């Protein structure tokens, strides 16, 4: 007997999609990493430019940047790029590395989808072929300072009596300092940050006062200072280049003055006559003037002029005569 035809029944088992969670690591050198301070973008590499590409941006948390799960329901190879979005902090060196995430989706013997993930790093601060750690560096500022000196001829130097300015290349006064009693002119630290790598020029000058001290000659030297800021890795270094002459020299010339010595000669038992006695004026043992008495007994030496500050010691003595009746 002929059996009636039976329609075959086909059963389809729907494959479950396989999921992958993209994740990279974040490290910061120089200070403590704060959650949410750095941003990362994942973007699908789509060979068909006309199709929209998947994108997502997240921030770091607990030292990682974790993106949303990606679902795959088809066997194939899928590529994504992960990069850090450079921030605006000028004192941070941001890692420009690009990480390519390759997802290979296959079907196992049971017909289930499975995925393998491979990360490769390129550019930036890449340390290995499979690097997926984004390393940022906080670049600490560098400080440097320098001194000049002050010398004064003609009298003793006083603390704080002369002023000096430090100017930048535009002529703007950055600092004003005075000398110590020992003649040191010390300027404060100059600080340079990550944006100031390069050459910086300055000028140091003595301030010439409007009301100049009488007898003072001021040094008009304009001393040029060059500071070169370089970067080795992520560390700043400052090198100072000072001129050969770093001493400001002033000269004090006091107004000329005079001194004149007058003495009196007395003679007992006899009338004093003019020019009867001779007197010598000595300095440092050397006779510098010789005078005789007047009839009234006065002895007057010539005026002595002084052009410099100092101490002078003199001796006046009577030159012995030949009259044996006079002691």
Listing of model-derived features with the role each one plays in the protein:
Residues 1-327:
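Solvent-exposed loop/turn and edge beta-strand elements of beta-rich ligand-binding domains
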């Amino acid at each position: 007997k002929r059996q009636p035809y039976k329609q075959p029944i086909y059963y389809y088992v729907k494959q479950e999609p396989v999921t992958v969670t993209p994740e990279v690591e974040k490290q910061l050198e120089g200070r403590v990493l704060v959650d949410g301070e750095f941003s990362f973008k994942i973007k699908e590499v789509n060979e068909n430019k006309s199709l929209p590409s998947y994108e997502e941006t997240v921030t770091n948390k607990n030292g990682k940047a974790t993106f949303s799960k990606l679902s795959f329901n088809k066997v194939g190879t899928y590529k994504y790029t992960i990069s850090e979005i450079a921030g605006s902090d000028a004192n941070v060196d941001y890692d420009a590395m690009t990480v390519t995430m390759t997802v290979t989706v296959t079907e196992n013997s049971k017909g289930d989808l499975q995925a393998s993930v491979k990360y490769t790093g390129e550019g930036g601060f890449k340390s290995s072929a499979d690097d997926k750690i984004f390393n940022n560096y906080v670049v600490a500022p560098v400080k440097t300072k320098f001194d000049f000196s002050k010398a004064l001829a003609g009298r003793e130097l006083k603390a704080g009596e002369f002023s000096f300015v430090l100017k930048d290349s535009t002529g703007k006064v950055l600092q004003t300092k005075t000398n110590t009693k020992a003649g040191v002119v010390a300027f404060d630290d100059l600080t340079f940050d990550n944006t100031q790598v390069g050459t910086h020029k300055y000028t140091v000058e003595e301030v010439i006062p409007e009301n100049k001290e009488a007898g003072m000659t001021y040094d008009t030297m304009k001393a040029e200072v060059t500071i070169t800021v370089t970067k080795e890795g992520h560390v700043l270094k400052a090198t100072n280049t000072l001129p050969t002459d770093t001493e400001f020299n002033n000269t004090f010339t006091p107004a000329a003055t005079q001194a004149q010595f007058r003495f009196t000669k007395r003679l007992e038992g006899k009338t004093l006559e003019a020019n009867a006695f001779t007197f010598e004026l000595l300095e440092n043992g050397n006779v510098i003037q010789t005078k005789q008495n007047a009839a009234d007994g006065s002895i007057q030496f010539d005026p002595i002029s002084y052009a410099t500050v100092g101490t002078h010691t003199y001796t006046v003595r009577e030159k012995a005569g030949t009259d044996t009746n006079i002691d």
